[in-house]
Swiss-Prot record:
Domain notes: The Q motif is unique to and characteristic of the DEAD box family of RNA helicases and controls ATP binding and hydrolysis.
Helicase C-terminal domain span: 312-460
Subcellular location: Nucleus
Name of the protein in its database record: ATP-dependent rRNA helicase RRP3
The protein's Enzyme Commission number: 3.6.4.13
The protein's assembly and partners: Interacts with the SSU processome.
Main location: nucleus
Species per Swiss-Prot/TrEMBL record: Vanderwaltozyma polyspora (strain ATCC 22028 / DSM 70294 / BCRC 21397 / CBS 2163 / NBRC 10782 / NRRL Y-8283 / UCD 57-17)
Residue stretches of biased makeup (Basic and acidic residues): 496-506
UniProt motif DEAD box: location: 236-239
């Protein structure tokens, strides 16, 4: 009997080794194609530099694009009337804040900061409307910290954010700007230990950054914690807070915290009827600071699309990963399953990828983001949980593997690149089923998206290799799912449901 078992084991080991060698060969084949393409690109760039006196057709097109950018910039500047400031020293800020801005290389206030900080410093409630990547976190953090310097007390300000990742990033901004002021902050989000968070709250932080569901849990259950003396309330990404059905929780929070002596800031990408209703219920005579009152993207973002034939989306994606080797890429998918599959496929083919989606626990999600931010992974494959608020400065490319179902999500996805004046590129993979969606997006943008230039012959040579690797991935993920089911993974109940709500994914 034991001999038979050993033979079977030996056979399965040989099969596994065979598959491993085969996949390694596929990865090497794909990498060789990438190297070949890079050499061609280098050759072309050398040829182009030799022909500087005789500009090519593509250079003429590039010049016309830059003219369009200048026109749109002029138009934007006409729309954005109001006072401009050459540096943060021009604002009435305490020296510690001005010094912190210098240390963070904040050269001068962005348009939303220039518009909202002066009235905020005068004590007004603020409605801030600005496109993603415009510097709105600092727009509310700076006036809060400036006032805190003169009136230090615990539980001074509470910032509500729709996702854990955004909450953590807001905390980092407050910690950086308040580094010379001894500011204490706490991040209170779902998916983390309630007792640890209760201990953080008992240390009496000045600034609390929270997702609404978890904040409500602590207001109801954590002894000694109260926001009765709260001076500032901020609702960041307010449109997203309402889209994620936090409305009832927000209503309960607004009833608990004081109205007298409280300053409220509401920041959103758009002004909708829901936002209008929320601001009427929570703000008093607010000053409206709008840098943009419609869906738009920044001028430094190049947006293109690729019409993908049926069954070739994986191949096109791997081709693009090859083309942009050395660049930082975020790939957006509509489902958690696709995010996990694409991450596994990319890693199997020896790319450097990590996933971000709602099936990961908080530590795993934080770990993924840290790997990507630190440059230890060049590709982040994410669902829309990551599309709002994530401030990763050096994202070069955004790829929409799945086209989002609404224009707002598209704007927020592509807003992960070309942030704070940097250039960036987004590429959307459009199947025959996505044509209606992309037409809607183009209608909102007010322009047609040009087609990305691709080498179709190079793509077709990758097809068999990618399909074979994807088949291996599907089998591996099915095996993992069976193991999870066998283990009876997952706790449920009231707290788990609340944590799911904070994740921002259904």
């Amino acid at each position: 009997m034991s001999g038979k078992v050993d033979k079977k084991k030996g056979s399965s080991v040989k099969k596994t080794e065979g598959k491993s060698k085969e996949i390694s060969a596929l990865a090497a084949k794909i990498r060789a194609k990438a190297l070949e393409n890079q050499k061609k690109m280098l050759k072309n760039s050398e040829t182009t530099s030799d022909q500087e006196d005789d500009p090519s057709e593509s250079e003429e097109e590039e010049g016309s694009d830059s003219e369009d950018v200048e026109v749109s910039k002029d138009k934007q500047e006409e729309e954005e009337e109001g006072e401009t400031f050459e540096s943060f020293s021009d604002l009435d800020l305490v020296p510690e804040l001005i010094e912190a801005c210098k240390n963070l290389n904040f050269a001068k206030p962005t348009p939303i900061q220039a518009r909202s900080i002066p009235p905020a410093l005068q004590g007004h409630d603020i409605i801030g409307l600005a496109q993603t990547g415009s510097g709105k976190t600092a727009a509310f953090a700076i006036p809060i910290l400036n006032r805190l310097w003169h009136d230090q007390q615990p539980y001074y300000a509470c910032i509500l954010a729709p996702t854990r990742e955004l909450a953590q990033q807001i905390k980092e901004t407050f910690d950086s700007l308040g580094s010379l002021m001894g500011v204490r902050s706490a991040c209170i989000v779902g998916g983390m230990n309630m007792m640890d968070q209760a201990r953080d709250l008992m240390r009496k932080p000045h600034i609390i950054i929270a997702t609404p569901g978890r904040l409500m849990d602590h207001l109801e259950n954590t002894r000694g914690f109260s926001l009765r003396k709260l001076k500032f309330l901020v609702m960041d990404e307010a449109d997203r807070l309402l889209d994620m059905e936090f409305g009832p929780v927000l209503d309960r929070i607004l009833k608990i915290i004081p109205t007298q002596g409280r300053t409220t800031y509401l920041f959103s990408a758009t002004m909708t009827s829901k936002i209008d209703k929320l601001q009427r219920a929570s703000l008093t005579n607010p000053v409206k600071c709008a840098v943009s009152n419609k869906y738009q993207t920044v001028d430094t973002l190049v947006q293109t699309l690729i019409v993908v034939p049926g069954g070739l989306k994986n191949t096109y994606l791997i081709y693009l990963m090859n083309e942009f080797i050395g660049k930082t890429i975020i790939v957006f998918t509509r489902t958690k399953a696709n995010a996990e599959r694409i991450t596994t496929l990319a890693n199997l083919l020896e790319f450097s990828a990590t996933a971000l989606h709602g099936d990961l626990n908080q530590n795993q999600r934080t770990g993924s983001l840290d790997l990507f931010k630190a440059g230890r992974r060049s590709i982040l494959v994410a669902t829309d949980v990551a599309a709002r608020g994530l401030d990763i400065p050096s994202v070069d490319i955004v790829i929409n593997y799945d086209i989002p179902v609404d224009s707002k999500s598209y704007i927020h996805r592509v807003g992960r690149t070309a942030r704070a004046g940097r250039s960036g590129k987004s590429i959307s993979l459009v199947s025959q089923y996505d044509l209606e969606l992309i037409l809607r997006i183009e209608d909102v943008l007010g322009k047609k998206l040009p087609k990305e230039n691709v080498n179709k012959d190079a793509i077709l040579t990758l097809r068999d290799s990618v399909d074979k690797a994807n088949g291996e991935v599907v089998m591996e993920l099915n095996r993992r799912n069976k193991e999870k089911i066998a283990r009876g993974k997952g706790r449920r109940g009231r707290m788990a449901a609340r944590d799911d709500m904070d994740k921002g994914e259904r």
